[in-house]
């Protein structure tokens, strides 16, 4: 392995037989976690560490998401990639990030909320109108395992920015008529800066710091928004979370984000599923381990099983073994009709609990029923033959 480089599967936290969907899902989660613009670190050292991790995650995804590069890496490791020129060629981690999340995605936090890591609009829209804040809003909500398997409704509360109704988003008393041309840039939005270098004087065009590139200045600040150009409204919205969502997946309301002068952003709601102490998910199936008294397993009888609808009684046959599986068809995740996916199964795995304590009299009676176990007898014969050799 190339010096200093971690295993790409380890970087993404996946196994070597992970599917392309597993790879993409792991990348989306880690890229969101370490994006330099999402969480500004408390110190420069931590910030640099996050940037390095972000670069590492993107590099791992670029290789493992490409069938040919992944095959080369699986066979020869980092050395194989070096020989092919991958590491020397270099790459832009943000290009990879944008290819997955979409062009124009950024987190541009403006300090309102830890969840307001939001997306910029496209370049085309930015050319038409200067938006003083990010239009798209991203929120994170948590649901439990049962809410994931059955689907649920959630009420969310969030703050939404809208253009000020008093100044129509211009930030000045009287709206657009309350603006003057910027005196520093004469309304151009930029100024020419001269800088000396070894090659002589170099002229460069830079954004006007006085008007922030807008070419106009406010004469009198709007009293309603104090020249911010927007006001904040409190929103309450009920959303439907369909059954079967994976943790980290998102719901999108195309016009539920911020608004500015008739332009609406998206509301992106990332859904995180809390782990269950009883159940585990395996694709569409749900798996649960059930403790059973060994005596009940031997003689058969009624046990209580956990299901997604609650605890139910189930009759097990005599001689039920530890590790044996009970499959309840359609007892797993049930998708809505729009998904057109078959419901999964509930898979119960039997595990023996610690035996009960019995009195000497009870133990004496139990010994009367003990008879040679053929499986144990076969094991002992194998053991004896092992010693003979």
From Swiss-Prot:
<keyword id="KW-0862">Zinc</keyword>
<feature type="repeat" description="CXXCXGXG motif">
    <location>
        <begin position="208"/>
        <end position="215"/>
    </location>
</feature>
<feature type="binding site">
    <location>
        <position position="185"/>
    </location>
    <ligand>
        <name>Zn(2+) 2</name>
    </ligand>
</feature>
<feature type="binding site">
    <location>
        <position position="182"/>
    </location>
    <ligand>
        <name>Zn(2+) 2</name>
    </ligand>
</feature>
<feature type="domain" description="J">
    <location>
        <begin position="5"/>
        <end position="79"/>
    </location>
</feature>
<keyword id="KW-0235">DNA replication</keyword>
<feature type="repeat" description="CXXCXGXG motif">
    <location>
        <begin position="164"/>
        <end position="171"/>
    </location>
</feature>
<dbReference type="GO" id="GO:0051082">
    <property type="term" value="F:unfolded protein binding"/>
</dbReference>
<protein>
    <recommendedName>
        <fullName>Chaperone protein DnaJ</fullName>
    </recommendedName>
</protein>
<comment type="subunit">
    <text>Homodimer.</text>
</comment>
<dbReference type="Pfam" id="PF00226">
    <property type="entry name" value="DnaJ"/>
</dbReference>
<feature type="repeat" description="CXXCXGXG motif">
    <location>
        <begin position="222"/>
        <end position="229"/>
    </location>
</feature>
<dbReference type="GO" id="GO:0005737">
    <property type="term" value="C:cytoplasm"/>
</dbReference>
<dbReference type="GO" id="GO:0009408">
    <property type="term" value="P:response to heat"/>
</dbReference>
<dbReference type="Pfam" id="PF01556">
    <property type="entry name" value="DnaJ_C"/>
</dbReference>
<dbReference type="GO" id="GO:0006260">
    <property type="term" value="P:DNA replication"/>
</dbReference>
<keyword id="KW-0479">Metal-binding</keyword>
<feature type="repeat" description="CXXCXGXG motif">
    <location>
        <begin position="182"/>
        <end position="189"/>
    </location>
</feature>
<keyword id="KW-0863">Zinc-finger</keyword>
<dbReference type="GO" id="GO:0031072">
    <property type="term" value="F:heat shock protein binding"/>
</dbReference>
<feature type="binding site">
    <location>
        <position position="225"/>
    </location>
    <ligand>
        <name>Zn(2+) 1</name>
    </ligand>
</feature>
<dbReference type="GO" id="GO:0042026">
    <property type="term" value="P:protein refolding"/>
</dbReference>
<feature type="binding site">
    <location>
        <position position="211"/>
    </location>
    <ligand>
        <name>Zn(2+) 2</name>
    </ligand>
</feature>
<feature type="binding site">
    <location>
        <position position="208"/>
    </location>
    <ligand>
        <name>Zn(2+) 2</name>
    </ligand>
</feature>
<feature type="binding site">
    <location>
        <position position="164"/>
    </location>
    <ligand>
        <name>Zn(2+) 1</name>
    </ligand>
</feature>
<dbReference type="InterPro" id="IPR018253">
    <property type="entry name" value="DnaJ_domain_CS"/>
</dbReference>
<keyword id="KW-0963">Cytoplasm</keyword>
<dbReference type="GO" id="GO:0008270">
    <property type="term" value="F:zinc ion binding"/>
</dbReference>
<dbReference type="InterPro" id="IPR012724">
    <property type="entry name" value="DnaJ"/>
</dbReference>
<feature type="zinc finger region" description="CR-type">
    <location>
        <begin position="151"/>
        <end position="234"/>
    </location>
</feature>
<comment type="function">
    <text>Participates actively in the response to hyperosmotic and heat shock by preventing the aggregation of stress-denatured proteins and by disaggregating proteins, also in an autonomous, DnaK-independent fashion. Unfolded proteins bind initially to DnaJ; upon interaction with the DnaJ-bound protein, DnaK hydrolyzes its bound ATP, resulting in the formation of a stable complex. GrpE releases ADP from DnaK; ATP binding to DnaK triggers the release of the substrate protein, thus completing the reaction cycle.</text>
</comment>
<comment type="similarity">
    <text>Belongs to the DnaJ family.</text>
</comment>
<dbReference type="InterPro" id="IPR002939">
    <property type="entry name" value="DnaJ_C"/>
</dbReference>
<keyword id="KW-0677">Repeat</keyword>
<dbReference type="InterPro" id="IPR036410">
    <property type="entry name" value="HSP_DnaJ_Cys-rich_dom_sf"/>
</dbReference>
<dbReference type="InterPro" id="IPR001623">
    <property type="entry name" value="DnaJ_domain"/>
</dbReference>
<dbReference type="GO" id="GO:0005524">
    <property type="term" value="F:ATP binding"/>
</dbReference>
<dbReference type="InterPro" id="IPR001305">
    <property type="entry name" value="HSP_DnaJ_Cys-rich_dom"/>
</dbReference>
<dbReference type="Pfam" id="PF00684">
    <property type="entry name" value="DnaJ_CXXCXGXG"/>
</dbReference>
<dbReference type="InterPro" id="IPR008971">
    <property type="entry name" value="HSP40/DnaJ_pept-bd"/>
</dbReference>
<dbReference type="InterPro" id="IPR036869">
    <property type="entry name" value="J_dom_sf"/>
</dbReference>
<feature type="binding site">
    <location>
        <position position="167"/>
    </location>
    <ligand>
        <name>Zn(2+) 1</name>
    </ligand>
</feature>
